[in-house]
């Protein structure tokens, strides 16, 4: 097998859920049938890796220092929704009428994997809460063991800054991930969130 082909297969394997066989199929498909698509993919990937960074306020992906949501004057700055990933933020934006701001953890607490508060930017979140503008923190972490532990930590952080923590409710399956929940369920869960005790 060609060394370049082996490198292409290994490159595809960095994607989540892509094993050896899937990576091999993708590599063969690009080389056999989609060379132009492969060129576009390589160019788009190169541009994104070089030019897309994180918003200094919410940690979402953006090409500028501050993302369009944080820069918008029409958003409710008293509400801050904390999510695990940009995909979760997108799911909430599409499924609900939420008009507040976000903070994206880019993960969840997982001490066994070496992911603690610092890796999730919780120092920056604490500074944002300390500024006094936020009155409600909507905790929208996934209903997994790590997500629940993260939610508990976030609720404590909110209370330290006199911010009311609330949590998504009803319809969110235990062990489920936000980006895979249908819009109706997510909209209902968002609308019926409850205060975290």
Curated annotation (Swiss-Prot):
CDD domains: TOPRIM_recR (cd01025). This is Recombination protein RecR. May play a role in DNA repair. It seems to be involved in an RecBC-independent recombinational process of DNA repair. It may act with RecF and RecO. The keyword Zinc-finger applies. One of its GO terms (biological process) is DNA repair. Residues 78-173 form the Toprim domain. It comes from Xanthomonas euvesicatoria pv. vesicatoria (strain 85-10). InterPro entries: DNA_Rcmb_RecR, Rcmb_RecR, Rcmb_RecR_Znf, TOPRIM_dom, TOPRIM_RecR. The gene is recR. GO terms for molecular function: DNA binding; zinc ion binding. HAMAP family: RecR. Disulfide bonds: none annotated. The keyword Metal-binding applies. Coiled coil: none annotated. Belongs to the RecR family. A zinc finger (C4-type) spans 55-70. PANTHER family: RECOMBINATION PROTEIN RECR (PTHR30446:SF0). It comes from the Bacteria. Keywords: DNA damage, DNA recombination, DNA repair, Metal-binding, Zinc, Zinc-finger.
């Amino acid at each position: 097998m060609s060394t370049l082909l082996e490198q292409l297969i290994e490159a595809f394997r960095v994607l989540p859920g892509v094993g050896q066989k899937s990576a091999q199929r993708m590599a063969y498909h690009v080389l056999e049938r989609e060379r132009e698509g492969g060129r576009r993919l390589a160019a788009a990937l190169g541009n994104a890796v070089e030019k897309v960074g994180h918003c200094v306020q919410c940690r979402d992906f953006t090409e500028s220092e501050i993302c369009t949501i944080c820069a918008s004057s029409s958003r409710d700055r008293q509400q801050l929704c904390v999510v695990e990933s940009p995909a979760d933020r997108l799911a909430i934006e599409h499924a609900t009428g939420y008009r507040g701001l976000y903070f994206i953890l880019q993960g969840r607490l997982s001490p066994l994997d070496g992911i603690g508060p610092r890796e999730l930017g919780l120092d920056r979140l604490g500074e944002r809460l300390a500024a006094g503008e936020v009155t409600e923190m909507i905790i929208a972490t996934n209903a997994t063991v790590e997500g629940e532990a993260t939610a508990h930590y976030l609720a404590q952080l909110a209370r330290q800054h006199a911010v009311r923590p609330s949590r998504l409710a009803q319809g969110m399956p235990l062990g489920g991930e936000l980006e895979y929940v249908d819009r109706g369920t997510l909209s209902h869960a968002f609308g019926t969130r409850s205060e975290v005790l």
